[in-house]
From Swiss-Prot:
It comes from Metamycoplasma arthritidis (strain 158L3-1) (Mycoplasma arthritidis). This protein binds to 23S rRNA in the presence of protein L20. Disulfide bonds: none annotated. It comes from the Bacteria. One of its GO terms (cellular component) is ribosome. GO terms for biological process: translation. Part of the 50S ribosomal subunit. Contacts protein L20. This is Large ribosomal subunit protein bL21. Coiled coil: none annotated.
Length: 101
């Protein structure tokens, strides 16, 4: 059984037991979270979401991704700017997919 959920402005295909990386959500490690924006479960498709359907997950880790370097340079001048950015993420383990009866 698989489901398509929406979180952090992205759509993700998940199955029970999967570990996924998503945009940061509030909570501590070990907390349980529920994703209510379920777009589809197997062959059932919502308009846009399925009612009374949820995906239950547990937060495994809060962290930051690898640093990316942002470098800006203006031609014909000596202006340069170098920045780094680390995007926060949350690693969650999918526990259960609850389907509406």
């Amino acid at each position: 059984m698989f489901a398509i959920i929406e979180t952090g402005g992205k759509q993700i295909i998940v199955k029970a037991g999967d570990t996924i990386f998503i945009e940061k959500i509030e909570g501590k490690e070990g907390d349980k979270v529920s994703f209510d924006k379920v777009l589809a479960i197997n062959d059932k498709i919502g308009t846009p979401y399925l009612e009374n359907a949820a995906v239950l997950a547990a937060i495994e880790k809060q962290g930051k991704a690898k640093k990316i370097v942002v470098y800006r340079h203006n031609a014909k001048s000596t202006h340069k700017r170098k920045l780094g950015h680390r995007q926060p993420y949350t690693r969650v383990k999918i526990l259960e997919i609850k389907e509406a009866k």
